[in-house]
Amino acid sequence: GMKESASDFHRTPFLEELASKGIRFSNARAAAPVCAPSRYSIQFGKSPARLRLIRVGMDASHIPHAEWQSIAKVLQSVDTNYVSGHFGKWGMGASPKVLGYDVGDGATRNVDGGFVNDKSQWETTLTRDPKKVFELTDRATAFLDSCASSQRPFFLQVSHYAVHSNIQTTDSSFASMNSRPLGDRHRHVGFAGMTLDLD
């Protein structure tokens, strides 16, 4: 990875390995510093300003979800054999089906991944499948296997609920991170465990 973006505590060995063997996008930008405007921008290819959606929690009823071209709709217009899937957090004003996705979890939000908007969100909970990391990965892998066996072109978007509060991690990742010295910039053992679980 890039040294200047590395954490002084969190560990992502598999992501680092993938980055070392793949393509590095060193001049990339997110459309917005928060989730909802970025998510809309990716789906519709429009800036948050053009979408008139610049913050989390803004009303999106002015956006004609069914009429606009999404990633899935564009791919299916190029090749009708394309199958599009979405797993995990959706968080948009219309369901994935409306945007042309064939397979997915529906109109999910942070709450579907274990989010509660109160002080408890920063407490660490130990669990077997934190933020549904393993369940989402298994379903995404099954989707990929299905597309490969049917030899259909595909687009898959996986939006993990991690890393996001509420803080959830496995016993083993918590123990691993708890045995390491805390960093100066990053020090939350549970959050670091959740990051390791996602990796």
What is each PLM-predicted segment?
Residues 1-199:
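Formylglycine-dependent sulfatase
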